[in-house]
Amino acid sequence: MVVLSKLVSSILFVSLVSAGVIEERQAASINQAFTSHGKKYFGTASDQALLQKSQNEAIVRKDFGQLTPENSMKWDATEPSQGRFNFAGADFLVNYAKQNGKKVRGHTLVWHSQLPSWVSAISDKNTLTSVLKNHITTVMTRYKGQIYAWDVVNEIFNEDGSLRDSVFSRVLGEDFVRIAFETARSVDPSAKLYINDYNLDSASYGKTQGMVRYVKKWLAAGIPIDGIGTQTHLGALTALASSGVSEVAITELDIAGASSQDYVNVVKACLDVPKCVGITVWGVSDRDSWRSGSSPLLFDSNYQPKAAYNAIIAAL
């Protein structure tokens, strides 16, 4: 037991030293600098395993004001078999966020990917409607009042701006969007409800134009869409904001090579668009990135801040 006690003490000492080195090195906080300009948050994506890494957690706690669950709130994680829900990973992240004063963006309720086969196999309209409503209601009820915003539907457009083929669009047509948003609004009226997508980098691109066109139509029909989430730059961000939503956010930012200028341009784009409320980078360290080979994040594989990190701080 004495040996074990010494081992635990040593681990704790190393963790505290690591955290201390990180905090000493990072005199500024991106979140504090960003929110000083009137924005709501500068956040990151994470999950339980990453938050249990001491170096990663120290950076999250020090530098970021918002968390998006990378995988733990997706359908295959929360409802892998019909009616049997698992909230262990999502609970951990939400509890951590509450304890450390971080906002949470729920990600994601309706997505064609990471979808259990039992959902993909549904071909009956009434069955899918019931399943969709039950899933959204169960997940959102658990975290009611604890989530700043939800990505209600995710990546539903093709590159030409048409609706993507999925079990939802095949069986329900575009009405699945109405069903999803109306259900979400009824469960948690205080949460901001988002439609989220990628490759919305140009105002003239077909996908961007399709997003704006559909959102305008859905808003006119009374569908309660509050925001559009994207990884984008100024021209497209302005176009998305003009769709009639009350806010937009940059939700899944990572840039291959982590160009300082590209990162600064994105930050400035959000600062320049009044409706842009926040930025979320998709991870902390290149070590844990889903595309680590392209070194896309603000911290390298040794948890050291990169040039892009320092450039953002300087720009703010």
From Swiss-Prot:
It is found in: Secreted. One of its GO terms (cellular component) is extracellular region. Its EC number is 3.2.1.8. It holds the Pfam family Glyco_hydro_10. The keyword Hydrolase applies. One of its GO terms (biological process) is xylan catabolic process. It comes from the Eukaryota. Keywords: Carbohydrate metabolism, Disulfide bond, Glycosidase, Hydrolase, Polysaccharide degradation, Secreted, Signal, Xylan degradation. Its main location: secreted. Disulfide bonds join 270-276. SUPFAM superfamilies: (Trans)glycosidases. GO terms for molecular function: endo-1,4-beta-xylanase activity. Induction: Expressed in presence of xylan and repressed by glucose. Gene3D superfamilies: Glycosidases. Residues 44-315 form the GH10 domain. Belongs to the glycosyl hydrolase 10 (cellulase F) family. PANTHER family: ENDO-1,4-BETA-XYLANASE C (PTHR31490:SF76), GLYCOSYL HYDROLASE (PTHR31490). This is Probable endo-1,4-beta-xylanase C. It comes from Aspergillus fumigatus (strain CBS 144.89 / FGSC A1163 / CEA10). The gene is xlnC.
